C-alpha cells in the first residue's frame, strides 16, 4: 500500500480510449454480442453447466470473435471516428507535464482534447489508426509515438494533426522525416523511442543555453578481465580472459557545478541521458599547471570541429551516445541554429534528492544467495521485523510507515497534516490505514521485500578519467578509482558495498571496496550523491547498466555483503555479442510493423519466472541461468534488431528440465498466485522468509499519541450543522465510494482517480467556500458519523485542513515522546515535557563532518551521513572551502564572504544585504496591513 501526493498543477487531463472506442456500428454490435456471450458463460459456470453446453457457448464465442476480427481486418483502410458514447469521464486520465504538453499548450484545469492515448486490444484497429489517423468531433488525429512504458502496455499517443504540425519542428529541432529518409532512414523503434522523449515527465529547464553546449565522442576503453563468453549460435559457454570494449560514458555527460550541484536526467530534442556535475574548468587549469606546454582546453566535437572550452564558456558537455540523431545534422551549429529558430526547450527529470532514504531489497537479489543460512537470513530480516512489531505501538514508527516524517520529501496533504498533528493517529482512518499497511508489509516481506541498509544511487563513471581521456589525450587513463573500487559519500564509514541493479537474474552481486576514507582527496572532484565506478572494472557488464540515468541499489548491510562475497567468489561477467539494429525508411507501414514487433516480442517476465524456478530448486543449474540471461537481453532488443537466437535442441531440453514445474511458493506473495499455482514451500532463500518474518497481532497503543480534537482541523468550529450540511456529507461519502483507489503509479496512464478528485473538488465548491465545505466535511466525517475511510477527503480538501492546522495549533509545541502530551518547547532538541524530562538523558554535543562539504560542525546526532546546517538550509548552493575546520559561506545577494559558524543556524546574507532585505520586508508589511481609512 502506497500513499501518493496528488499534485493538481502538474497533471493534465486527456482521453484514453481502447480500440473498441473506434469501432463502426457493425463492429460494435458484434462486440456487444461477444460481451453478452461471455457474461452468459460466466453466469452458467456459477449456476452449473454441462460440458456440451459449455462447449457450445465457447464455440459461439469463438465464432463471434473470429467474425469481429475479420470485419476489423476488412476495415484496415477505413479512417475511423471516436464513438460519441466513448467520450465520458471514465475514459479521462491524467498525464504529467512534459515538453510535449508544454508545446501543445495544454492546461491542467480542463480536459485537453489535443492529445489522446490509445490502448490496443485488436491490432487491426491500431493498424488503421497508425496508417490513416482518425477523427473526433470533426478534428483529425494522427499517430505520434509511444514511450517505452507505453509500448510495454500496448499503448500509443495520437495528437490533433493541426496542433502537431504547428509544434513538430520544436519537438524535432527542425529534422523532418523526409530528411531522415534521404540519409538512409533509421531504425524504426529507435526513432519512435527518441521521438517519445518529449513525452517524458519533465520540468522546464528555464535557463538552459544551447550556446554553452558541445557534443564530443564518448570515453571508450578496452578493459581486460575474465568473462563467461557465450556463443549466441551454439550456446557454448567458455570462461576466458579477454579485452572487453566498454563505453564508460554511455548516456552520461558533464555539467559545471555552478549550474547544478545535483545529478539529473536531461531531455531535449533527440538528446537524453544523465548530466553529472564535474568541474572540468578546474581540471583544465590543473592540467595546464602540470604541463604548461599545451593548452588542455581544446577539444574536438563529434563533427571534427575544435573548441576552446574556456574561451567559448562551455558549461555542458554532451556525449555522442546522448545525441541520438547526430548523424542527420551536418554540424552541431546546425542543431543549435534550429534549436533557437524553432524555440526548442530542454527539460529536467529525476533530479537527485538531497537526502536519499533507505530502500528495500527484492526477491531477485535474495534468491541468488543460495548458501544463506537461517541465522544470516534472520539478521537481514531484523529491521523489517522490528518495524512490524512497532507499527501499532510506537508513534515514530507509525509516522515513518505512513510517510509523515522529515525523510519523506514528497508528502501528500494527509501526510503533511499527520506530521504537523500526530494526534490524528487516534482517528479511525489512520488506524485502518496502519492495519492495512502492516498487512501489506507482511506480504511484501514474505515476497522478499525487506528493509535493509541500502540506497538507490545514480551510477556515474570516473569523470576524472574521462577528462584525462578528452583533455589530456590519454588513451587508457588511470582516473581517481583504480581496480574495482567505487566511491560514494553516502556511506563514508562502509569499507565495502554490494552494488546491485534490477533486473537481477544471475549472481549480479558486485561487492566493491568503497574508497571514501582511503582516498579523501577524491571528494574534491566527486561531490554528488551518486556512486562512482572505476573505468578499470567490468562492473557495467556484471550489472548490465548504462550511465544514462540507471540507478543501483547500493547495500551496506554487512550480512548481505559477507554472503554475497562467499556466493560470488567464482562469478565473472557474462559476455556475448549483440545484434545490430538495421535502418529503414520511415513510412506508416514501417511504423506499424515496428509497434507490432515491440508489442509481441517483449515478454521478459516469462524468462524471469523461469530463472526463479531454477534458483528455488535444490540444485540450481547456473549454466541454464546464464543462457536465459542472454536470451532475455536479446528479447529486450528484439523490437530494434528483429533478431533472436535459435536455441539448440540440447539446450532446449536442458532448460525445460531445469524450469519444469510450478513457480516457487513465495510467488503467492510476490505475484498474487493461488495455492494450486505454486510449488510446496521449499528450502530456497525467499521461501524460508515465511517462517523468518515475524507476524504480530495489531494492538493499537495510544499511550504516547495524545488527545485528538477534530476541531483543530476546522477553520470555524462554530459552523452550523443542519439538514443542508448533512446532505453535503452524505453526497460526498456516496461519491467517494465510487472514486476508485489512489494506490496506482503517478506515472500510470490509467490514473482515473486523480481526475475524479479534481472534478469532485470542483463540484463541491459550488456549495460554498473552500473553508465552509472543508469544515462541514470535517464535522460530518470526524464527529457526527466517525467515517473510517477518509482518503478521498484528504486528497480533495487536505490543503485547507493543513492550513487550518497551521493556524490552530499553538506555536513552538510538540508531543512528548513518553506521555504524548503537547507542550511548549524551550529548546529545539527538547523531546519530553517537564513531567517526563528527568527521564530524558540529553545527548552530548559532538563534532561531526558534513558528508556534503566536509566542514566540521557541532551536533547531538553524530551518525553516518551527517549534514551540516548550512548544507541543509541552502542546499550547498553557496558553500565553499570544503574540508576546512570552518564552514565559509557567500552572501546569496552580493557574494561577499560571511563569517564562519561553529554551531547553530547560519545566515545566508551579509549584514548589509540583510538590513536592506529587512527594510524592504517592513515596507511590504506596512503596505499590506495599512488601514483603508
Per-region residue spans from a language model:
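Beta-strand-enriched accessory nucleic-acid recognition/scaffold domains that flank the catalytic cores
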Residues: 1-544, 551, 557-887, 893-895, ...
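Flexible, glycine- and charge-enriched loops at secondary-structure boundaries
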Residues: 915
